[in-house]
């Protein structure tokens, strides 16, 4: 039986949760308005741009003007400090050239966030003189970074064909020795339907985008085994779970893995799999509850310690048998 006092308490609790939610929305809106005021000059264009979903000329307080959509504007507004760090030039609709010293990249504005994350160590590893297998190459940014870190070759797997023109431009601009495959990875060879958002701000096997496309999938075990790579980087939403079914023998053909993980369940399964395959979790960069980048290193010391022990047992067993 529910008493009147109980109903009143539930009512109050419900109203409080609504008020808290509304306050949260107001705070987010106010924060956005303040950032807009502090970073831009052409305030009268902001609302029409958001409502019409069309490109509008937006002038920032550093004097630069770009023809932007609302999502592109938010990237620059919310990361305004990066406009001081990088030279950003618009060379077409949804096409920007980003430069930082010798580093030159062409792509969408989302590439700016990827570049900054990598410069902050997202994919940092010892790849000097090594071959890197880059699964989820996006627009070629990570391939360029691996090359700048000394990789002698980068093997790129990127299933979205529209990204390949950027990959080719970026590896040419930065003189990257690369091999490009228009494929994704999975448990077996075949094709798969994926969803994605426009304007190319999200893509993955798990996302619920407005657009659907079919991509070619290669067996991840086959790709690893034939690559001859020393380092593997995987950033393809949902595809990382295919590593769980790869044999330890094949996983150990690689020295170092960099894996972007998109669910806590896959994270736990991968940690268990790699530890059982004689890898140690060297580092983990957590971005939120679901998203993190894990760095697994093959434990050569433990393997070399096991081998003499096994070899030492063999003569003793032989003596017992005689």
Question: What are the functions of these language-model segments?
Answer:
Residues 1-322:
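Phosphate/nucleotide-binding beta-alpha loop and adjacent structural elements of enzyme active sites
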């Amino acid at each position: 039986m529910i008493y009147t006092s109980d109903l009143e308490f539930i009512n109050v609790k419900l109203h409080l949760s609504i008020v808290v939610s509304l306050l949260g929305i107001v705070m987010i809106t106010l924060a956005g308005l303040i950032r807009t005021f502090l970073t831009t000059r052409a305030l009268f264009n902001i609302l029409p741009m958001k409502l019409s979903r069309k490109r509008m000329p937006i002038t920032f307080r550093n004097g630069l003007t770009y023809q932007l959509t609302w999502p592109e504007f938010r990237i620059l507004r919310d990361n305004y400090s990066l406009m001081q760090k990088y030279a950003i030039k618009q060379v077409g609709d949804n096409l920007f050239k980003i430069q930082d010293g010798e580093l030159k990249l062409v792509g969408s504005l989302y590439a700016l966030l990827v570049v900054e994350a990598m410069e902050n160590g997202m994919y940092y590893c010892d790849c000097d003189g090594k071959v890197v297998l880059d699964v989820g190459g996006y627009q070629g940014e990570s391939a360029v970074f691996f090359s700048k870190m000394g990789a002698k070759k980068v093997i790129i797997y990127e299933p979205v064909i529209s990204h390949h023109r950027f990959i080719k431009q970026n590896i040419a601009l930065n003189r990257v020795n690369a091999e490009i495959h228009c494929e994704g990875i999975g448990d077996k060879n075949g094709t798969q339907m994926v969803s994605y958002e426009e304007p190319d701000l999200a893509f993955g096997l798990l996302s619920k985008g407005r657009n659907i496309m079919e991509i070619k999938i290669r067996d991840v075990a086959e790709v690893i085994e034939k690559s001859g790579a020393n380092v593997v980087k995987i950033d393809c939403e949902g595809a990382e779970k295919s590593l769980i079914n790869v044999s330890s023998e094949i996983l150990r053909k690689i020295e170092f893995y960099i894996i972007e993980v998109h669910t806590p369940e896959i994270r736990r399964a991968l940690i268990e799999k790699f530890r059982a395959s004689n890898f140690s979790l060297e580092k983990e960069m957590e971005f939120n509850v679901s998203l993190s980048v894990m760095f697994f290193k093959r434990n050569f010391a433990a393997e070399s310690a096991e081998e003499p022990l096994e070899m030492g047992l063999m003569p003793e067993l032989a003596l017992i048998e005689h």
